[in-house]
Amino acid sequence: MSYPGQGGNTYGGGPPGGYGGYNQQDRYGGGGGNYGPPQGPPPGQYGGGYGGPGGGYGGSGGGYGPPQGPPPGQYGGSGGPGGYGPPQGPPPGQRGNYGPPQGPPGGQGGGGGGYGHPGMGNQAPPGQYGQPGPPGPHGNHNMPPQGNQAFGGTQGYHFQYSNCSGKKKALLIGCNYIGSKNALRGCINDVHNLQRYLVQRAGYKPDDMVILTDDQRDQRSIPTKQNILQACQWLVKGAQPNDSLVFHFSGHGGQEKDVDGDEDDGYDECIYPVDFQRAGSIIDDVLHDILVKSLPPGCRLTALFDSCHSGTALDLPYVYSTKGILKEPNLAKEAGQGLLGAVSSYARGDIGGALSSIMGTVKQATTGSGANQRAKQTKTAPCDAISISGCKDSQTSADAMEGGTATGAMSFAFIEVMTRDPNQSYLSLLNNMREVLRGKYSQKPQLSASHPTDVNLKFIM
């Protein structure tokens, strides 16, 4: 099978190459079949991959064997986390009607650079980052409060922050779409750079990571739709309060017509696995069902998306401005009741006024309050999930060159800011990432959360 696509070096803007007729209906399934060996370096695993002869996903983090054939339209055949049934098919006329992705900003895309650093195996990577710089101008930030955080009065909504003191697991995915005319250069590098950062700076172990990149020869380590979905299930399996999970995707992203009415703009955001032409994309609803709804209160999920149209790629309903306030204050008036009212009550001091006006907003409802109401009622979650994405839902994300190495602009900015000064709040991290990108890229990183969040708290993972 050939790799997908035609076009330039941005991370998406619809299916790479604008292929029509690929299978969107198999939203939860894997897309099995024979996947030809990818081009790339000699055999070997990049960091705690899918383990050795035993076949399970790496390390002590799970017991999944080799991926099975695709289930009939569901997670493993009998419904996914939370008992979700088979999704509806796409509306007529919406299959792949997207043009090729736009080229990168002038002078920024593509060029040079191999795959960067080799895999780490079971050893910690060599030191690549300098010593942390002096503390930034943001001062010390408070750690998140512990225990159940109630909001909404009699409506009884609640969530729990994670202190990230439990088990740490990571799933890192990089799709360069090797061999296609629409190939990207920086996505595999993004994975290795983030893996190195997590091990050296954040206390993660290679044995507790699954790495999916399309330069590997082990078929279980290729970022196909089936492998990505099964690895997502590995990531959340056995999650406990105060655990810390990382999901990272670098590759092509796009938008598809929304079929369940939860999107304010009428489109679901999606990511494209390397076999998207046969197996279809993975939409935000599916990622949310697996990665967010299955987590217990107090379990942290940090999702990092370096792809086009990724602003709400995990479908988290509370979206933050760079000032940490409502982007669209009139949305509170639109809601009338439900979670937006609950959020307002929470902001007024249900837990001691910790949030003040530092609140997010449910995604803007341009198709009426119905989509807004549905999103806020079904997407708010008691776990501690946040998403940092490379750009707004309407933007493309650049495949960039930094220091002579191909990289995703968002991934570079995140590692740069956190390496320079790890003492960041959610708000300072968002603003400092935007500052790193300012003047070079038009994209604006986005921050969203599964519950109303005090964005002045210390960012931990």
Curated annotation (Swiss-Prot):
Keyword presence, Hydrolase: yes
Gly residues bias: start-end ranges: 1-21, 45-66, 74-86, 105-119
Domain of life the protein comes from: Eukaryota
Entry's EC annotation: 3.4.22.-
GO cellular component: cytoplasm
Keyword Hydrolase: yes
Biased composition, class Low complexity, residue ranges: 121-131, 138-148
Entry similarity comment: Belongs to the peptidase C14B family.
GO terms, molecular function: cysteine-type endopeptidase activity
Protein's UniProt name: Metacaspase-1
Origin organism lineage: Eukaryota, Fungi, Dikarya, Ascomycota, Saccharomycotina
Catalytic residues of the enzyme: H252, C308
GO biological process: apoptotic process; proteolysis
Keywords in alphabetical order: Apoptosis, Hydrolase, Protease, Thiol protease, Zymogen
Its biological purpose: Involved in cell death (apoptosis).
Pfam families (UniProt xref): Peptidase_C14
Region annotated Disordered, chain positions: 1-154
Enzyme class label: hydrolase
